[in-house]
Each structure stands twice: as C-alpha cells, then as structure tokens.
Amino acid sequence: MRNFKLLLSTIIIFPSISFAQADNEIQVYASPTIGKNLTIFELHSNYTFKGIKNLPNPKSAHYLNESLEITHGFGDNFELGVYFFTTIAPNGKYEYLGSHIRPRVTVPQSWKWKIGASLSAEFGFFRPGTNESYQWEGEIRPVIDKTISNWYFSLNPNMDFMLTGPDKHFGFGPQFKTVYTIQQKVGVGFEYYTALGTFKRIHSFNEEEHLLGPMIDLYLNPKWEINGGFLFGLTPNSNQQVVKLLIGRRIGK
C-alpha cells in the first residue's frame, strides 16, 4: 500500500510532482486479517483540496486518487491483497499509475498476546504520472493495536522503500489512529500520518510530512467497511487539506 512516503529527496528531484497529490491509499491498518475464504473489495478515494504551501499553481494539486484493493483470506492468519492505483489529474485526464501485491500475517489469537499485531510486506510498480517511468517500490508495515473499553488505538511504524529510479531510499513514516466507539455503530477519532525522512537522515520538522485530522468509522453492517476523514497539513511540505473515503464490501463464507 502506498502511504505517506514522499520524502525530502523527492522534493528536491521532482518539486512539481512530489506533493501535487496525496498518496493513493491513506489508511491506518488494524491487526486482524480477513477471515479464511473471505474476500473484501475496497475503494480508496482521496482528493487534495490544497497542496503544499507556496505552490506556483495551487490548482496543480487538485488530484482525485482512486485505488481498488482486493484482499482474500487464505487462512485464519494470512491474507493476500492486490492494488490498482489510478488518478484523475487536474486537467481531467484519467491515468493508471501502477499495482502492488501485499501478503500479510497476523499473530494468532491462541497466542493470547495482550495486544494485536500483524506484519505486511507490499511490493510493486508505480509512477507519479503518465509522463514518468514506472519504478519498483514497496513498504514493510508492522501493525500494533489495542482495544480498551470503547477506545481503540493503532500504531503503524511504516517503512517504505524505492528500489529503482533517482529516489532510491529506505524511509520511515509512522502512522497512528485512535477511535472512540459509540453504541457499537459509530467510531469517531483522529488519524495521523507522517513521512520523517530516510534511515540515513531524519529531516527537520518543516521538511517532513505531518498530517492530522478527524475521522469517522461506520459499523452499519459486518459486510461493509466505511471510513472517512479530513486531514490538515502541519508543515509547509505537507498537503494542507485532503479528504479521504474508504468503502469496502466483504463477500464469501
């Protein structure tokens, strides 16, 4: 899954592209994998209302990203997902940007850990736009979460990597989510996304990406997954206003 991994090195090399649009999938993971023989189809949508500060052309940030994620459970603790990344550019052009695969394993409940934990490894090809070359990239995402009464907390200390192209790196961008559930129907809270730099160099605060905003989860039906939110950039190199929506549908028995 492509998450907030746009680092300072990308800013230097591709300043007009790096923060012209939000990432294609904006999500903090929970530790459980999908059940055995179940499949979930998820549409990740996000729109950048306002890009990084001081863009020469503010309208150049107005991308609508649409990503289809299909995940199947092959066991009680293992799933495999595939992603198809697309975008509608500010000029209205529809573009296919790439695809990833993502195996993930979770700690079995029989181990009786006091926290939930899982690990995903994502890999594939991606390009920022049709005028750019595809590059091989991916991420390693540990997931640690915990439910305490009506409160839920999840931490994803996400690590991304780029294997080809001028922006080869191994970066670090933790993500966090907390939710308070009301009558088991609605969850309200906030999500926080970062891109701090590479393992060779953590950037200064103003050079990093920090996005924070309110979110809502709807638990209307076990077959459906609905999550939405609005993110605000906390640094000049962050997109300043991004809206996100996730709609998922489970099928199978």
Model segments located where?
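Cleavable N-terminal export/targeting peptides
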Residues: M1-E25, K253
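Transmembrane beta-barrel domains of Gram-negative outer membranes and organellar outer membranes
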Residues: A20-K253
